[in-house]
Amino acid sequence: EIAQCLVGSEMCIRDRNTADRSIALMDTAIRRRFQFIEMMPDSDVLRKIHADKVENLDVAAVLDKINERITFLYDREHTIGHAFFTGLKDDASLAKLQSIFEKSVIPLLQEYFYEDYQKIQFVLGDNAKSDDSLKFILDEKVVAKNIFKGNVEDVIDLPEKRYSINKVAFSNINSYKEIL
């Protein structure tokens, strides 16, 4: 249908998230009819459009570090795209960065890592932060026998930690600096 409406000199540009497998059949059909050009996240785009700084934080470097860690822990298909951060061009505020992380980055990481918060902590550098107020994801040791009655030591795979999102960290520029 799309190909029939295009004149010889026109191009059809489509983007897609390669991690989204819900459209696999449609994707296969489109791949047979069109050329694909891979476009991975590119922090230089943020630098070129001046969307790479919030206060004295190098947002492009933060994106690179997050994506390096995601690639190591998962794969390159689940890296965070630079497009999430392009809004910083018009509003280079901490509040805008906070919104990007709270509404886009954290939910994607939760989905990608199936809510394995320890891996999310690694991606965000929380595992190396000594100040809990700077951690995006907090962890608290859980003692099963304090929660359940009876003998729980024999039960396999009980969690040893409970995780929570630390809303305070999102409004502190140092939380982002310590990702690096």
What are these regions (language model features)?
Residues 4, 27-29, 69-77, 154-155:
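A general structural signal for short secondary-structure junctions and capping/turn motifs
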Residues 21-26, 45-49:
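Switch/connector loops and helix/strand junctions flanking conserved nucleotide-binding motifs
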Residues 25-43:
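A short helix-turn-beta junction within AAA+ P-loop NTPase domains corresponding to the substrate/partner-engaging
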Residues 47-137, 141:
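Conserved AAA+ ATPase small/helical "lid" subdomain
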Residues 121-180:
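C-terminal engagement/docking regions of AAA+ P-loop ATPases
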